[in-house]
């Protein structure tokens, strides 16, 4: 947990540095704004790295807690699963948050750019669908490899099926269907489900 706290604290510092050019501009500090703007790319790279390490660190915590976790959810590949799931969860969150922001601030966007938001959402949906299918295939291979067939017909097994089918496979198909048929509403519902 100490490592995860460090990742989180450093990520918050990186996020503050990413946002600081706006504060410097608001305070009319032009030299500071230019300096902070030059730090942005390095800070974004640091932030992405820290968030990836944060997700793998959470997954590594599960490796140490094997006796306390049901065998359907425990795997030696849990850090990889955490990493892959964080990708599609992040894409889904961007779709959800972007939709809300677009509705609230659409009056501030020039009309010629309204359609570009839809294209961005379709691209994010395609990425989320691919990532969710990769995650599902990985989960299925681990399930088959670990020979956990006897655990499926239990109460915890039913919850596992709800998670894997209801919150991974169905949203993945919804993202793919929404991308293929250019349906923003289906993509938004899938983003909420994921």
Residue spans for each PLM region:
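Long, contiguous internal "core" modules enriched in hydrophobic/ aromatic residues
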Residues: 2-180
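Central hydrophobic cores of alpha-helical transmembrane segments
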Residues: 186-194
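Substrate-binding/catalytic groove segments of enzymes
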Residues: 181-185
């Amino acid at each position: 947990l100490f490592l995860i706290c460090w990742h989180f604290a450093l990520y918050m510092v990186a996020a503050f540095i990413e946002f600081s050019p706006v504060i410097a501009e608001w305070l009319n500090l032009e030299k500071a704004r230019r300096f902070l703007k030059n730090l942005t790319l390095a800070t974004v790279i640091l932030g992405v790295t820290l968030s990836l390490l944060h997700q793998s660190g959470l997954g590594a915590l599960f490796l140490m807690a094997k006796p306390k976790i049901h065998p359907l959810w425990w795997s030696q590949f849990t850090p990889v699963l955490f990493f892959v799931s964080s990708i599609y969860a992040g894409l889904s969150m961007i779709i959800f948050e972007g939709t809300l922001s677009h509705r609230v601030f659409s009056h501030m966007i020039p009309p010629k750019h309204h359609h570009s938001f839809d294209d961005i959402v379709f691209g994010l949906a395609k990425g989320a669908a691919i990532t969710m299918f990769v995650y599902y295939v990985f989960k299925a291979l681990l399930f088959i490899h670990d020979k956990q067939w006897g655990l499926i017909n239990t109460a915890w097994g039913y919850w596992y099926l709800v998670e894997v089918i209801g919150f991974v496979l169905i949203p993945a198909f919804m993202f793919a269907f929404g991308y293929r048929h250019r349906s923003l509403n289906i993509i938004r519902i899938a983003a909420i489900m994921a």
